[in-house]
Amino acid sequence: MRTTLQGPRSRSSLASYAGLLHSRRLQPLHLIDAIGPFFRGHDVRTINWSKIPWQNLPKTRDAAAEAWWVQVRDDLTKFADQAAAWGFNAVSLDDVTHLADHAWLEPELRERIALYREEFTRCFAIFTERGLAVHLTMDVMTYTPELRRRMTEAKRSVNDYLAELLDGFFVSFPQVAGIIVRIGESDGKGVHDEFRSELVIQKPAQARRLLLDLLPVCEKHARRLIFRTWTVGAYRIGDLMWHRRTFASVFEGLQSPALVISMKYGESDFFRYLPLNRNFFRTSIPKIVELQTRREYEGCGEYPSFTGWEYERYARELKHADNVIGCMVWCQTGGWVPFRRIALIDSEAIWIDLNTFVTLRIMKDGWVVEDAVRAFAQERGLGDANALIELLRYSDEVVRELLYVEEFAQQKLFFRRVRIPPMLQVYWGNIFINHSVKKLLRYFVHEPEAALHSAARCMGRLEQMIALAPRAGVPVADLEYMRDTFGLLALAREYNFTEFTPEIETRLREAKRAYKVKYPKRGLRARYRIKMGFQPFWLHRRYIGWAVELLMRRRRGYRIIDRLLILHVLSMIYRVIALRKPHWIPGFAKESAMGVDVVFR
């Protein structure tokens, strides 16, 4: 039996709440994430930007803690002023778990939650006073040791517990307009907190049941439930973001004025070269598109990685989908990287801010990219807007053709329930230069000369960008950093697509050494990690081809071999390898984010 934290509402009260939800069901929703200020003072080499670093927030009240909260509120005020001025009408923050009290939590943790509730109430007011509706993220499901023990003893289901938790939470925080539910990804290995989220929704039917149990609570309190379809590919639910039948199993026939579906624009993470997700056209439920303006795989705003023309194409296509009511702009969230520019606050975050401004003008107002860039240049007091537009066109070209390898990026590849990312050599803040990457690229790329010519042209474009920067009124140092970083990629491409010689190894090692000297580890500008090695990869090209043809497919639908072998037997094989031969699995793959093992669940 589900317990509630308040008495029943009157029929007239429920009717008025239902009316409120229905009235705003199709109202535009333009969300932006506001977690940046909470990373102040988070001094680690690689930052987990996936959520607020709760373990570093003040746990007591003293002068230092008060100064920290004052700084956060000052930053949030600056952020909210800018977001509201640009036209956003909602923000996302982390998270329900750290603000919802419950009797089953550890006593010392409840004391800390009481402190967080008091401080976040002040933070929420900053947004609501400026017309920005507050939405809080929530992973399903997050445990503490004591909570897990109590739920096990009481045989309490996750859905039942969450429904009770939200019922009380909504009463405590009437200023919170809704929740943003994530079921397909949980805390990574870099999260060190008493609360730990884990994946508990494994089947489409479980996701649907979760919605059926939580939506009535949201309707009762007139709050939105924004349900994210993003997953990392684990379990049967792992293809929710792109598989039409899984998507239909979860959402078909659902009718609730509280429900909004949130989908990333593509069938993978925030990469280029991805077609628009066709699930936008498969339901009339209100939905928003997720867009990232601090591109976690493309430098995080350390250099221009302009998204304007990319998002303009998606916006054009989305006009033909029913009930797309807005967008969720991730301007800070995402990635395990050393880069630390904070959007809408730091003056150095100009490239993130530019992407964010242009994205909203495209998605909300239907502007063309060039007009949006000119408006941003005028607002920020930059230089020649035409020079800036030219610079951004070159940047778009360089990112697409040198950060990515175009011929590989254009290929549609699936492994198990995941669409393979179109980027192979760069991952977050790491550049991989080694023989295994070389062999893979030479297998997938059939026109290496074109790739080499493209790299040379891009290096010329970077010099043109540096020359344009003073006229455009943007930081020359950012463009020089981009040239130095992409110069390593151009040299790596030469290594990848030509025969190996000792001379190319020497040039690469010298280039890496010079890069590290120019951008020291604890210097003012974070650098990429160059993971370099020239040990020959033992697998012959022919066997690589066999492995690719066996394990990967070039269409969305599953093959017979996928259903018989890849989705089931391969999981068992991986578990045996992880147990008996853990050294076969690269350390980076094991320790990054949730770890590669999640793909094999």
PLM feature spans:
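A generic "cationic amphipathic patch" detector
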Residues: 96, 104, 140, 147, ...
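Active-site cleft segment of glycoside hydrolase catalytic domains centered on the general acid/base Glu
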Residues: 149-155, 185-221
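Feature activates predominantly on carbohydrate-active enzymes
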Residues: 1-184, 219
